[in-house]
């Protein structure tokens, strides 16, 4: 059951919808859940519980400074996003906590926004929810997510990049999410399953790059103990750079089809670079490049170099026999294309690898 909205006082240059602003003798205003801010705003107290979105961003080039406070939902499905912006640019959301929504921050369309020094936690979408992530970037470009913690969000990801097409979403701008930078975050324990199901059915990723999402940078993140894969590049996602991340402890929950990998490149992706990552202690493969699926080509013309991948294959594979896109044994390094099919593997260190082309220029440890 949804609960009553709490008001919060804000200071600084703040412009609100006329129906929600209430001047006070101190010169500040009170802001209710669901309000739209159109000037830079600093919180002076917590805001919530909010039953339907926290705050809407209604102008470009403004800053929402949570000032160490939190915006929180009701911990029920369909609470929307804690901070929601559509078609905005130059917005900064910083310095606080957002929890108990369907997404912590949702960026739809627009670009050039920043999420920094935030804790996004316990944001769980449900049936018919629009989101299921700590941060969701939907058909938006050149955004920066940095120095933040994404913990126990889902059921999709800690950070999700989505390139929407017509019919994917009832509101958001369609198009490719490109030029986004996910840098220096801690993305951990995002394990929730869909529709409130058991964690044994989770397909929740740490960082999720959905199909046909190109040209993004994932760098310097600690990605740990998420439900399925640590960093997943979905089908047709190309020219992304995955570098200098620590990726460990994934895939320990799911008990059907497959467990989870440290870093996975799904089929049809090309031109991706996976380099200088530490990948260890994952249930299935450390780093795996998927081969053909039906009529679709495998992931080809990718570069996987100078990674340290060891101590993976922690759990027995669910499909130990070869056959199908996920069948067969698992390794620290694995390419499921025949003879690696124009993928360049070079200078990696590993304990187990298959086939031999994954070991070029590298060395076992």
Task: Briefly describe each language-model feature range.
Residues 1-28:
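Secretory targeting and sorting signals
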Residues 29-32, 36-38, 294, 355-365:
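Post-signal peptide N-terminal regions of Sec-secreted extracellular proteins
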């Amino acid at each position: 059951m949804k609960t009553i909205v709490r008001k919060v006082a804000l200071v600084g240059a703040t412009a609100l919808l006329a129906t929600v602003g209430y001047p006070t003798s101190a010169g500040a205003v009170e802001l209710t859940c669901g309000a739209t801010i159109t000037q830079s705003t600093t919180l002076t107290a917590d805001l919530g519980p909010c039953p339907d979105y926290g705050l809407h961003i209604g102008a470009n080039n403004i800053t929402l400074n949570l000032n160490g406070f939190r915006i929180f939902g009701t911990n029920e499905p369909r609470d929307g996003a804690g901070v929601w912006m559509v078609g905005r640019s130059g917005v900064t959301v910083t310095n606080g906590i957002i929890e108990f929504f369907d997404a912590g921050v949702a960026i739809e369309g627009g670009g050039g926004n920043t999420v920094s020094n935030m804790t996004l936690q316990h944001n769980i979408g449900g049936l018919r929810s629009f989101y299921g992530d700590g941060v969701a970037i939907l058909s938006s470009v050149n955004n920066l997510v940095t120095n933040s913690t994404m913990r126990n969000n889902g059921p999709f990801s800690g950070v999700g990049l989505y390139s929407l097409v017509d019919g994917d979403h009832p509101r958001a701008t369609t198009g490719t999410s490109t030029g986004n930078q996910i840098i220096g975050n801690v993305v951990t324990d995002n394990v929730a399953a869909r529709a409130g199901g058991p964690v044994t059915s989770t397909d929740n990723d740490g960082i999720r790059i959905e199909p046909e999402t190109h040209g993004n940078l994932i760098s310097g993140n600690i990605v740990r103990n998420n439900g399925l894969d640590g960093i997943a590049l979905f089908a047709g996602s190309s020219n992304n750079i995955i570098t200098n991340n620590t990726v460990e402890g994934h895939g320990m929950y799911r008990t059907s089809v497959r467990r989870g990998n440290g870093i996975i490149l799904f089929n049809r992706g090309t031109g991706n670079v996976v380099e200088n990552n530490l990948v260890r202690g994952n249930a299935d493969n450390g780093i795996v490049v998927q081969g053909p699926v039906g009529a679709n080509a495998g992931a080809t013309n990718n570069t996987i170099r100078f990674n340290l991948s060891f101590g993976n294959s922690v759990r027995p594979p669910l499909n130990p026999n070869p056959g199908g896109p996920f069948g067969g044994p698992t390794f620290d390094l694995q390419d499921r294309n025949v003879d690696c099919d124009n993928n360049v593997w070079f200078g990696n260190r590993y304990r187990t690898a298959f086939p031999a082309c994954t070991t070029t220029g590298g060395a076992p440890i």
